[in-house]
Amino acid sequence: MSIESIADTIKPKSDQLNADDLIAGPITVTITSGRKVADPKQPLILEINGGHKPWKPCLSMRRIMAAIWGDDGRAWIGGCVTLFCDPTVVFGGKEQGGIRISHISGISKSKTVLLTATRGKRLPFTVNPMPQYDAAQFADNLPKWNAAISAGRFSKDDVVYKAQQSGKLTEEQIQQIGA
């Protein structure tokens, strides 16, 4: 067994994506589905690609996504976000760390939203546009990816997930992978 990456050995035991899952670094994911549940603290569960546990975004991150994508959750499906562990997130009066969005699809320039930090105190939170995957790099990598998929070494979803760690793929690029 290779020790190339030990990220899987430090994941917390939980049914959801946690800030501790992101200690090794940020992840860029696509929202594949979502549902509302009867939990007042975490009423939204978003399924994300890449083999990750479901993400239950906090109120502030739900507000960011609503400010950018609107309040119809169906429009969020297919959207991409880069998630990171922010160690300064306060919960219960103490810095506990939490999941924040650094980049989001659907915007062409950085966007700042005022979010409630504590009662009566609002702070700006800025998200950046999702960078696009470099077209020349895509053209160079596509034959290698398709060969790996044909050989059964990777699935199309594996390739898309890994590629989107470098930049958002267009729908046309995604269709070319594994074709």
Report the location of each language-model feature.
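Short, contiguous, well-structured surface segments enriched in hydrophobic/aromatic residues
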Residues: 22-67
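Short, surface-exposed beta-strand/loop "edge" segments at domain boundaries and coil↔beta transitions
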Residues: 52-57, 109-110, 123, 168-172
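Short nucleic-acid-contacting surface segments enriched for D/E, G, S/T with interspersed K/R
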Residues: 67-82
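Short connector loops at helix/strand junctions that flank enzyme active sites
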Residues: 26, 41, 76-80, 94-96
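OB-fold/S1-family single-stranded nucleic acid-binding modules
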Residues: 89-111
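Interfaces that engage single-stranded nucleic acids at replication/repair/recombination sites
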Residues: 116-179
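OB/S1-fold single-stranded nucleic-acid-binding modules
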Residues: 1-20
